[in-house]
């Protein structure tokens, strides 16, 4: 007899209606992976058929949903009840939670949702950019890095420097105007009528939990996304067909280092 095996099986049954259905249909096969006594196995078989187990399942799912809704609020709002239900139920069906920490669970769910968007199994025009933005904000908040405002000196040999994004910053490419989309979402307006283009949203951790956001147009977007610390400004200007002043302004502002 293994109390740990019984507790694990019971936890899995409470968390997964799909597992309960499988256990009710074929208990021997579904419970074979747990270290159980005959008595424990019979108890679990009975529980799998007991409709009252739905109540703790609902409580568990409410808690898991709160972990996502409190950390990825705009993504959840954009999804709406139907889309959120579809994604979360599919995500929960992948297996039990691996953590009870809100941020870790949000990042894990976000990674799952991004995977669904990129393989085409889930469709949403705005979710990818919203998820990437909120996930970047969560990551920055935990990083301990801080960006400080102020004018920086631009080196005379900038053309030979290999710039990269400030470590306390993240840049998220957007296909729509971030300011317009976020304003509409926060005001409860439908996400409709937005033209596609080359936009980006820069996030900067400023310390003490403060997050600075700034939107950029096409030229700055290309420069910020391409500056990975491996190519010189001269090479980037030639490759992207950009004037050197774009990089000079980003360095002066401290977005690139």
Feature locations, PLM:
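Low-complexity, glycine/alanine/valine/leucine- and proline-rich hydrophobic stretches
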Residues: 161-229
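Long, charge-rich, low-complexity alpha-helical segments
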Residues: 1-156, 206-257
């Amino acid at each position: 007899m293994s109390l740990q095996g019984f507790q694990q099986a019971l936890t899995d049954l409470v968390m997964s209606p799909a597992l309960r259905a499988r256990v009710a249909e074929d208990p021997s096969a579904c419970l074979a992976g747990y270290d159980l006594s005959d008595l424990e196995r019979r108890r679990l078989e009975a529980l799998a058929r007991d409709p009252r187990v739905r109540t703790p399942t609902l409580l568990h799912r409410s808690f898991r949903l709160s972990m996502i809704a409190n950390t990825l609020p705009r993504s959840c709002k954009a999804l709406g009840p139907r889309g959120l239900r579809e994604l979360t139920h599919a995500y929960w069906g992948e297996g039990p939670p691996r953590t009870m920490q809100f941020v870790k669970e949000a990042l894990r769910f976000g990674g799952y949702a991004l995977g669904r968007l990129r393989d085409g199994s889930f469709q949403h025009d705005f979710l990818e950019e919203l998820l990437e933005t909120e996930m970047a904000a969560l990551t920055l908040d935990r990083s301990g890095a801080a960006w400080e405002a102020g004018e920086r000196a631009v080196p005379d040999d900038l053309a030979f420097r290999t710039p990269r994004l400030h470590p306390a910053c993240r840049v998220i490419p957007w296909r729509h105007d971030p300011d317009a989309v976020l304003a509409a979402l926060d005001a409860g307006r439908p996400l409709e009528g937005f033209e596609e283009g080359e936009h980006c949203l820069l996030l900067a951790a400023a310390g003490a939990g403060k997050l600075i956001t700034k939107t950029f147009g096409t030229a700055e977007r290309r420069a910020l996304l391409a500056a990975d610390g491996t190519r010189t400004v001269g090479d980037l200007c030639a490759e992207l067909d950009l004037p050197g002043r774009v990089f000079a302004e980003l360095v002066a502002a401290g977005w690139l280092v």
